């Protein structure tokens, strides 16, 4: 049987699905540790930019989990994603150890721009700025990619990079009570929040796992972006980003929550 993870319900994705909005025709690149073949995922393509790891299969688990929150299939098994018909692309920029070079991430963003991706999910970050990475985010954005990135997990009152860059949409994490997760980085530049605690999703070995992190929050927003893009195919990445913020459910302090909790129902009305 298929279960609907709490975060998918909380962002009201099923209401969008009931309107026929499932992310169909929208290309979403997952810049991560790769994505493992899984019965609850449909992976359309991708590329690896990790030296020594030519396969886009996931030797870590992180990328497969992120991918499921975006687009786990609406079938009779496992879990359900925010945009179950979105086209998933596995862009490996982090190795099996979960670490990656700035150059790899920049190449992944370049690939997303070159290959017509509508959304790029970056559930990754660093406390240090990088001109190379900022340029890559700006270039991908100029080519129509909506770059969605995790705020970071140190609990600090500042946002990680690349999420902090103006052209990246920074996503923080909330818990089941719609409170900021204790680990979720916040402050200037935070755009929006989404569920990031006890998030159930796909995992390598045709299994499922529950994980915590702003990495888990980010794909809820990437998935919602795919729903909005299907409904409004002519909209630019900037229009989609602004619409997601304008339709978010306010949770109070913009410092802690940005525009609030992403709301797929309001965003697809």
UniProtKB/Swiss-Prot annotation:
CDD domains, A to Z: Peptidases_S8_Subtilisin_subset (cd07477)
Active site: 32, 62, 215
Pfam families for the chain: Peptidase_S8
Location, primary (coarse class): secreted
Subcellular location: Secreted
A molecular-function term among this protein's GO annotations: serine-type endopeptidase activity
Record-listed E.C. numbers: 3.4.21.62
GO BP term, example: proteolysis
Cofactor binding notes: Binds 2 calcium ions per subunit.
Domain of life of the organism encoding this protein: Bacteria
Residues binding Ca(2+) 1: 2, 40, 73, 75, 77, 79
Keywords for this protein: Calcium, Hydrolase, Metal-binding, Protease, Secreted, Serine protease, Sporulation
Domain Peptidase S8: 5-268
Catalysed reactions, semicolon-separated: Hydrolysis of proteins with broad specificity for peptide bonds, and a preference for a large uncharged residue in P1. Hydrolyzes peptide amides
InterPro entries for the chain: Peptidase_S8/S53_dom (IPR000209), Peptidase_S8/S53_dom_sf (IPR036852), Peptidase_S8_Asp-AS (IPR023827), Peptidase_S8_His-AS (IPR022398), Peptidase_S8_Ser-AS (IPR023828), Peptidase_S8_subtilisin-like (IPR050131), Peptidase_S8_subtilisin-rel (IPR015500), Subtilisin_Carlsberg-like (IPR034202)
Binding site for Ca(2+) 2: 163, 165, 168
Role this protein plays: Subtilisin is an extracellular alkaline serine protease, it catalyzes the hydrolysis of proteins and peptide amides.
Protein name: Subtilisin BL
Organism of derivation: Lederbergia lenta
